[in-house]
Amino acid sequence: MNIIEQKFYDSKAFFNTQQTKDISFRKEQLKKLSKAIKSYESDILEALYTDLGKNKVEAYATEIGITLKSIKIARKELKNWTKTKNVDTPLYLFPTKSYIKKEPYGTVLIIAPFNYPFQLVFEPLIGAIAAGNTAIIKPSELTPNVARVIKRLINETFDANYIEVIEGGIEETQTLIHLPFDYVFFTGSENVGKIVYQAASENLVPVTLEMGGKSPVIVDETANIKVASERICFGKFTNAGQTCVAPDYILVHESVKDDLITALSKTLREFYGQNIQQSPDYGRIVNLKHYHRLTSLLNSAQMNIVFGGHSDEDERYIEPTLLDHVTSDSAIMQEEIFGPILPILTYQSLDEAIAFIHQRPKPLSLYLFSEDENATQRVINELSFGGGAINDTLMHLANPKLPFGGVGASGMGRYHGKYSFDTFTHEKSYIFKSTRLESGVHLPPYKGKFKYIKAFFKN
């Protein structure tokens, strides 16, 4: 038995002590986690800057603040979330009462990505703790400074058999995903998600897969172009485009395309200044592998660049870039970009835009900028996507009352707020039947009972 396997079985043993099923225990662990995050705030911010070049305002808002808010909500609502529910019982089961009990799955695995390497560890972990599970966390090896801070924070806060962090790369992940966890929560690419899903299926382990895809933005002829440009630039270029729900491409009505490009270019200068590379508010690509993947896409689209296009390998810097005259068969349209390059395509009618999106895998997010209520309702009703926004980008993630998750190739399962608790909770059903009464209608011998059985099922 290797070290990882031993940690897994130690975690299973801790769960079997029944400690985590105590509601007061769970609330106390969430309280400890909140306190630890606050005490590690400066270390977390420094690590996020070192690994991804994140400005501390952006880092706090998207990584720390949102996590602390989730903990606060979970602690406040946990008593209600965990209540056993008494549900209606049909007359033919009289005298019986029916219940749904919320119970933890057991020992869960959380695999996190590099783009929001702190928040995407702790958001699912909050749900796992609130639901009463033990957990093993695998942070991304591509953000090693954040991973080290997470490990220190967890080790100083929790019993290692309760919450454990496994650092490492592909080898460690392969070992973990083949173990018989009670639940696996994965955030990352579609290709790796398929590997995780296949491995989990060997042990019939339920999974949540939070992946990505090419999330479109539709800008119609009625849109407020200034507002659209600001909100699209925020959604696309936050974290240097390394956001799973970032706008991947724009579908703009041909009549307002030039105005939109002008507005986007102006907004980028307003956000980051004339020398964007020197801006303290603009991030960096996580590593050279992803940098070279993105510069390869840029090189294939040199004739399409209408803004940006510059890069610096030493800094892993890629300038925010706008591409015009892009077609569906362009290289940039064949994969999720996951970087600061924004292709702009045109359409003539909403039917054409909807058909274009229908022809592609279901996106994790979709955004529409429009003042036309009919167009808005058509997009909402006719297109399938994980989540999205009308006249904004990204911000649907900020509401903990909304479930977040993909559909089709962009993922399965959902979380955030109570949905995180539900994800890591098994709803166990049972009935309680009195021993004082028994109709006997359902028991052999059945002679003469047919009409009574039919009568029961009519009620």
Curated annotation (Swiss-Prot):
InterPro entries: Ald_DH/histidinol_DH (IPR016161), Ald_DH_C (IPR016163), Ald_DH_CS_CYS (IPR016160), Ald_DH_CS_GLU (IPR029510), Ald_DH_N (IPR016162), Aldehyde_DH_dom (IPR015590), Aldehyde_DH_NAD(P) (IPR012394). PROSITE patterns: ALDEHYDE_DEHYDR_CYS (PS00070), ALDEHYDE_DEHYDR_GLU (PS00687). GO terms for molecular function: aldehyde dehydrogenase (NAD+) activity; oxidoreductase activity, acting on the aldehyde or oxo group of donors, NAD or NADP as acceptor. It catalyses: 4,4'-diaponeurosporenal + NAD(+) + H2O = 4,4'-diaponeurosporenoate + NADH + 2 H(+). Pathway: Carotenoid biosynthesis; staphyloxanthin biosynthesis; staphyloxanthin from farnesyl diphosphate. The keyword tRNA processing does not apply. The active site is at E210 (proton acceptor), C244 (nucleophile). Keywords: Carotenoid biosynthesis, NAD, Oxidoreductase, Virulence. One of its GO terms (cellular component) is cytoplasm. Disruption phenotype: Cells lacking this gene are unable to produce staphyloxanthin and cause accumulation of 4,4'- diaponeurosporen-4-al. Its EC number is 1.2.1.-. Involved in the biosynthesis of the yellow-orange carotenoid staphyloxanthin, which plays a role in the virulence via its protective function against oxidative stress. Catalyzes the oxidation of 4,4'-diaponeurosporen-4-al to yield 4,4'-diaponeurosporenoic acid. Belongs to the aldehyde dehydrogenase family. This is 4,4'-diaponeurosporen-aldehyde dehydrogenase. The lineage of its organism: Bacteria, Bacillati, Bacillota, Bacilli, Bacillales.
